[in-house]
């Protein structure tokens, strides 16, 4: 009988030690939309000019809040979305030349584990944009999560070197 009791306790200890309370939370809990800048003819990546700045406009309680969300000369940008159902970005090329990109999206709160912080995922439903300097914007992946993946291509008409 002592032998069975000993085996029972060993099994119980093994079972309970396998139930850890430490959750494996994702290292990145922020969902960012990734836009790649592309040549509309060749589909090659192009860099945004040095002076370009991208601002995000959020309407909250009837007030517009404007924040700079990107200001680097890169071939892509990763920017946050608003927790409202609409996000607007303005790309300022010069003092007077700019384009506006407006996203309409569903917000989906997500919790991977009770011990992990809540995250917000987004599903893009519609996109509108101006074409002052950019040619077009293509939706590549409507699901915006904490995973790093391309969601949009912004196409520009690039002057040829000929």
Segment roles from a protein language model:
Residues 1-4:
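Positively charged n-region of N-terminal signal peptides that target proteins for export
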Residues 6-10:
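Sec-dependent N-terminal signal peptides
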Residues 15-18:
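C-terminal motif of bacterial Sec signal peptides marking the signal peptidase cleavage site
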Residues 20-25, 75-162:
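Extracytoplasmic cysteine-anchoring/structural motifs
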Residues 26-38:
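A short, Gly/Thr-enriched small/hydrophobic beta-strand-prone motif that recurs across taxa
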Residues 36-46:
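Structural motif
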Residues 46-62:
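Extended low-complexity, serine/threonine- and proline-enriched intrinsically disordered segments
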Residues 66-72:
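Short beta-strand segments within Ig-like beta-sandwich modules, predominantly Fibronectin type-III
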């Amino acid at each position: 009988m002592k032998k069975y009791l000993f085996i029972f306790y060993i099994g119980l200890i093994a079972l309970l030690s396998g139930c850890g309370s430490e959750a494996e939370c994702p290292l990145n809990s922020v969902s960012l939309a990734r836009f790649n800048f592309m040549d509309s003819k060749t589909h090659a990546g192009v860099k945004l000019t040095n002076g370009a700045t991208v601002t995000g406009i959020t309407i909250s309680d009837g007030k517009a809040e404007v924040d700079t969300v990107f200001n680097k000369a890169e071939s892509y940008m990763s920017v946050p979305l608003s927790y409202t159902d609409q996000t607007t970005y303005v790309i300022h090329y010069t003092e007077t030349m700019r384009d506006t990109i407006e996203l309409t999206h569903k917000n989906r709160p997500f919790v991977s584990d009770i011990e992990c912080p809540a995250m917000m995922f987004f599903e893009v439903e519609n996109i509108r944009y101006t074409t002052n300097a950019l040619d077009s914007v293509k939706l590549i992946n409507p699901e915006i999560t904490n995973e790093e993946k391309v969601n949009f291509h912004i196409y520009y008409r690039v002057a040829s070197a000929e």
